[in-house]
Amino acid sequence: MAFMNFGKRTLLAGDLKLNRGVDVLRDPIIGTTWFVDATNGLDANPGKTWAGAFLTMSKAFTSAASGDRIYFTGKVREQLSTPAQVFDVRVIGIGTRPRHADSTPAGGETATATWAAPASPTAASALVRVRQQGWSFENILWVGHTDNACIELYRDAESGNSERDAGHTSVIDCRFASGYNGISDIGGVPNVLVQHNRFEALTNFCILGVGNIGAGQSDWEIVDNTFDGFTNGVKISGIGCRVQNNTFTDGGTPNTTVVLNMANTSGVGMGENFVIQNFFQTSTANFNTPDVVGNATDVWAVNASIDSTSAGVGGNFEWGQPA
């Protein structure tokens, strides 16, 4: 392989491994890497190595510029808004699969990357409100508050430098363990990726989206997720979305709660969604309002209900738009 000279690198003392052994990390060509240790950091630190990590995510947010990365460990207990006019930032929890801390055995008492509400949370405020495009949240255990979302996607009607729009957000490899909503789009933002996450025990919705400033949830990809033990699943104003290879349990109260609704009534121009290759604990008889709802121009194909297959016998799939 030919050697490629990409110019200078910033060398950082410290690595991304759980043992935090001394190593050298090469910063990518564009952007700065910031570190947050919510247990042992200090906001007076420079924030550019694990040894000099910030204590709070707030400090990392005020330090970050477009294209940066923020790695964190420990338990963040803050309610924040992403900074204005800062785009394309990745917030990444270190560790393996997101988990709760355990009191025993010794060594398991500190989970590697959790984001939870503070001890005295501000009412009706999300853990993080995303206000500009291109932010990504990865490998995080979310423990939400009882009256608002873990992640809130925001959009307003301003223009120029005053415009706020959370389009192109990515939520990847996270676990939403509790709270009111998992992801809430209150403005109608486009091109959101929700991939390989687990949604559990949320008391309102796993994903809730409305049409407001934007027409609805256009060009979203909701793929490879597990929706398990929730009250209501997904309810969005879907426009040209792809919902594929997800598994859904049957909601808090079968026949009266939402499992998957692509036609939230506040949207404009809903339809042309591809809802394919999903698996539902919901029975075929309940592929209708309010459990499973589509639009006339959607493509619903190769979806399996709990009773579409008999034990030991080749099964059938659900085709066509549910009512």
Predicted feature descriptions by range:
Residues 68-69, 79-82, 100-104, 117-125, ...:
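Short glycine/acidic-rich loop motifs that flank beta-strands on beta-rich extracellular proteins
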Residues 2-59, 305-312, 321-323:
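Right-handed parallel beta-helix/beta-solenoid
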Residues 158-163:
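Intrinsically disordered, low-complexity Ser/Thr- and acidic-rich flexible linkers and loops
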Residues 88-95, 133-144, 164-180, 189-208, ...:
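Right-handed parallel beta-helix
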Residues 5-6, 11-13, 18, 36, ...:
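Extracellular beta-strand solenoids
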Residues 88-150:
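Right-handed parallel beta-helix/beta-spiral solenoid domain characteristic of secreted/periplasmic
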Residues 1, 6-8, 13, 19-21, ...:
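Surface-exposed or flexible loop/turn and strand-edge residues in extracellular/cell-surface modules
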